[in-house]
Amino acid sequence: MLLVLAAALIGRHIEKTDHTLHVGWPPLWSNWNPHVGPGTPAAVAVALAVVAYGPVLAARLPWRALLGAAWATAMAWTWSLALVDGWHRGVAVRLTTRYEYLQVIDRFHDIPATLRDFTHHILLGSPDPWPAHVAGHPPAAPLTFVLLDRIGLGGGGWAGAWCITVGSTACVAVLVTVRRLAGEELARRAAPFLALAPAAVWMGTSADAYFAAVAAWSLAVLALAVTAPTGTRTRCIAFGSGLLFGLTCYLSYGLTLIVVIGAGVLFLGRNRVRALPFLAAGAAVVPAVFTLAGFNWWEAYHLLVERYYDGAGGIRPYSYWVWANLACTVLITGLATAAGLGRVGGALGRGRHDLLPRRTPQGPAAPSPGPTAHHPNPATESRGPAAETRLALLVLCGLLALLVADLSGMSKAETERIWLPFAMWLLPACALLTRPRAWLGAQAVLALLLNHLLLTGW
């Protein structure tokens, strides 16, 4: 919390003297506005229920029932926090402001023509420039809301419901990944923390929640592919992971860094070599479709960098945000995650040898595997040094992706929503903690205070 306090005090001083941060309540894009709303009773009830019963239910429920319960809880938590600000302010208008995607729905009446012309409207000096968030993302992001509008789900209410509903599945995707790579016990221990994450304050309502879910599912499907027996079904799963990764890159330029976490998943999987060709083939599909339609991803990205530095990105001081962004991360992941990250290094140190491939005898002296040979499946391993080390490596990859994004200088402020896709992969570190109820209580109190004391911009 010292980092958060320093970011708040130093940030207020910089904003008061230089006016260069362009945020109302540093380090968050928010304003001080203590309030309650219709979602307050539900938010308190969900928090109390998860703190009281979450760890026990996570340990006892059948696995599939646990996944359903985690999704339902994450949705209830996110919806209730969003409704603290009321339906109109908390959900319906969040994606309709002058910066957002719903402002450009009518400009996509001819989708192929709009894609061909997309890069001509990114720069601020171009004719009819895109709003900030449209210019800042590849066209799959606005196209999502265009397609929702085309099927009769137009307007801010439906867009908000889409982001919350889909975004809440990110916790399920992370649980699936942790179970396949580090074992079911650790996944069960992580479940209440994923469902009750302070990040829900910004997942409802932000399009980045939707992006986080797509990215998380691309990694979850990859984890399934690299831990399943080789076969046609596994190859199809790897191809599906590639499809989702390709879509992720066309929802957000910065989410190409998900490849860092993907590399960790591949390293921990036993069938990574056989999955790679099908993963690559799937990953090429979405880029090929958009490229053939006339959209140039690389050109658009370079134009975005130019626009970023022509706007607030060129004014906000890197010297402040390069560390204040990490304070934002503490707020969206909570004190429990910070404590869990403190145990990640120890877990890696204790079990680092378990991550290295074991050498087996070769030649005539090699023992025969026999008809009952069994390859260990991490999903069935109990908690222990090896499982904790595998979890620690996965979390470390998430942290590394976040740090690369931070050092890039393309994420100065607003990272409480922009980094949601990375923050989800830090939360499993909470599985390494003892006294889960106390830490869950700390997570809930932090989220409730943030949502009731501040009026967040997302």
Set out the residue ranges of the language-model regions.
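Membrane-lumen/periplasm interface segments of specific transmembrane helices
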Residues: L3-H19, L247-Y250, V259-V260, G264-R343
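Hydrophobic, aromatic-rich transmembrane alpha-helices
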Residues: A49-P55, V330-P367, H374-E388, A401-A405, ...
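Short acidic/glycine- and proline-prone juxtamembrane loop motifs at membrane-interface regions
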Residues: A199, M203-F211
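Perimembrane helix-loop-helix junctions
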Residues: L219-T230, R235-F239, T256-A281, E381-R383
